[in-house]
Amino acid sequence: MRTELLCDESKYTDILACIFEASTNNVDQICTPSGLIPRIGEEFIRDHCDFSAIIDFPYGISETKIRVHEILLCQSRGIKSIDLVINRYDTENGNLHSIRKDFKICYEVCKTKGLRIRPIIEYRLADNEFLPQLCYSLRENGADEIILGTGSVVDDLLDNIICSRLIEENLDINVISCFPVLSQEHYDMFNDSKIHGIRIKSYKILDNLCNIR
C-alpha cells in the first residue's frame, strides 16, 4: 500500500523533523501545502525527497488564476506533483460545472509544465449521488488518482474505507485516503482493504507504526 505523509507544520524544526522521519521510514511521498514550499530547501525537493504541493489547502476556495499562480511557483522550485484541493463549497452544493472548469484549466497548466495533478475531495461534504459523478468527471478530465479528504474534517474510519473501495471498484481509479491513522491497527485495516494508498496526517504518528508496507 502506498503511504504518503502530510507535512503542514508551522515551525521550521518540525518541517525538518517531518522530512527526516519520512526519509527514514517507508514513506513514498511528502505532501505539503504550497505556502510552505518556499521554506523547504530546494536540495530536498530536487534531489532527496519526493514532494507534492497541496494547492489552496485546506478549503480550495481561491480563484482559478490564484491557484494557477501557486502551481507555477511550486514548479519553479522543483515540485513535480500537484495536489489540487477541490472547492469545498462547490462540492457541498454539487456544482459540477464550476469544479470541472477549474480543474481543466489547472490540469492543462500542469500538463504543459510536465507536472502530475491529483484532485483532493472533501468527500464528507458531498452527497452520495454527487460524489461518484464528481470522481467520474475528474477522471475523464485527466485525473489518474483521487485523494479523499484534506485531513481537516472529522471522519469515520469505516466510512472512509467503504467510500474509497467503492470509488476504486466502480470507477477504476486509484484512491489515496487521508484519514487520521493513529495506530498500527488503523493502518492494517486500510492495508487489508486493498485501498491503493493512505496519507498520514502527522510525522509524529510514524512512531506508532511498526510495519509500513
Language model feature labels by segment:
Residues 1-8, 28-32, 49-57, 82-84, ...:
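Hydrophobic faces of well-ordered beta-strands that scaffold small-molecule active sites
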Residues 1-76, 137:
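Conserved N-terminal beta1-alpha1 strand-loop-helix module at the mouth
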Residues 34, 38-57, 96-118, 156-183:
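Alpha-helix-loop-beta-strand connector modules within alpha/beta enzyme cores
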Residues 81-147:
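Conserved anion-binding
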Residues 62-76, 126-137, 165-177, 181-197:
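Catalytic cores of alpha/beta
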Residues 40, 74, 119, 146, ...:
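Conserved, mostly hydrophobic/aromatic
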Residues 23-39, 81-101, 147-158:
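Glycine-rich, proline-tolerant flexible connector loops at the mouths of alpha/beta enzymes
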Residues 55-58, 77-91, 140-157, 179-182, ...:
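Glycine-rich phosphate-binding active-site loops on the catalytic face of alpha/beta enzymes
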